Amino acid sequence: MVTWIRGEGLHRQAKEWAREHVKRLEEVGITPKLAIILLNDDPVELATQRRFASLKARDVREVGGEAEIYELHDVPPERRTKEALRLIESLNKRDDVTGVIIQKPVPPFVDERALFAALSPEKDVDALTPDNKKRLLDRFDLDNDVLPCTPAGILELFRMYGIEIRGKDVVVVGKGELVGKPLSVMLMQLDATVTVLHALSKEREPYVKRADIVISAVGRPPEIYRDNPWRLTGEMIKEGVVVVGVGGKVDPISGKWHFDVDEKSVAEKASYLTPNIGGVGLATRARVLKNLIRTSYQVARLVVSSRIVGP
């Protein structure tokens, strides 16, 4: 019988922890404020990103912080990078903004590298600036570092449920900058044997079939995409596997979510499985709160006093 890997516990703990630290930060004149930048004008991506952004903003406000969402998807393509860079420069300079998320993916005509190179590492909630990404190549501290939110949330779920990673064959489906790539590096740091599959991988099924852990981070459900769709089903996995579903998109017409993992068939064979609703999404939101608190302390040390001690 499958054990469901639920994110409610992590999310609840993170909110309680963040609420206490918001009070501490306010004592030194800092209120955590998250700025979220939306750049993608693709209807599916925009609908999905708006949903994610609203949930993150709600969490921040519920713990006593503030949140602002900036939508630049209506800016003409030829000007969008320039306008985004101007906004990032402004947010970097504002002492009241203590964390920034550039919601990914950005459209292909936007210079993504330039955006993350311009973002202050101290305010980088997703840990995607060049300086923050380097941390993953050495050692990382799951409890104290600002780390990519979804990968760190998944590792926290594994720890909470006692799921062993060391020495396990792990397949990560998807090599995106937000989840697949950083997660695969983090898993290798934890002594897993990692295989990364993507759209050009040949014969993906044999790798998936023999994996001890499968993490699906594609986000191309067949209900929405005809080009390179992906759906993980029960017939593709072995008995007793651990399955983590990350990818999901919102249909901009119906407003309905569609996911990477066929929950019903996979649950019949998996030993552990994240539910499509209430699993990785909540763990990610928990990590956003933790990272925002940490970036807020970094800002406090810069603008108030270097002697301020945070988590």
Swiss-Prot record:
One of its GO terms (molecular function) is methylenetetrahydrofolate dehydrogenase (NADP+) activity. Keywords: Amino-acid biosynthesis, Histidine biosynthesis, Hydrolase, Methionine biosynthesis, Multifunctional enzyme, NADP, One-carbon metabolism, Oxidoreductase, Purine biosynthesis. Pathway: One-carbon metabolism; tetrahydrofolate interconversion. InterPro entries: Aminoacid_DH-like_N_sf, NAD(P)-bd_dom_sf, THF_DH/CycHdrlase, THF_DH/CycHdrlase_cat_dom, THF_DH/CycHdrlase_NAD-bd_dom. It catalyses: (6R)-5,10-methylene-5,6,7,8-tetrahydrofolate + NADP(+) = (6R)-5,10-methenyltetrahydrofolate + NADPH; (6R)-5,10-methenyltetrahydrofolate + H2O = (6R)-10-formyltetrahydrofolate + H(+). GO terms for biological process: L-histidine biosynthetic process; methionine biosynthetic process; purine nucleotide biosynthetic process; tetrahydrofolate interconversion. It holds the Pfam family THF_DHG_CYH_C. Gene3D superfamilies: Leucine Dehydrogenase, chain A, domain 1, NAD(P)-binding Rossmann-like Domain. NADP(+) binds at G174, K175, G176. One of its GO terms (cellular component) is cytosol. The keyword Hydrolase applies. Its EC number is 1.5.1.5, 3.5.4.9. It comes from the Archaea. Homodimer. Catalyzes the oxidation of 5,10-methylenetetrahydrofolate to 5,10-methenyltetrahydrofolate and then the hydrolysis of 5,10-methenyltetrahydrofolate to 10-formyltetrahydrofolate. Belongs to the tetrahydrofolate dehydrogenase/cyclohydrolase family. HAMAP family: THF_DHG_CYH. This is Bifunctional protein FolD. The lineage of its organism: Archaea, Thermoproteota, Thermoprotei, Thermoproteales, Thermoproteaceae.
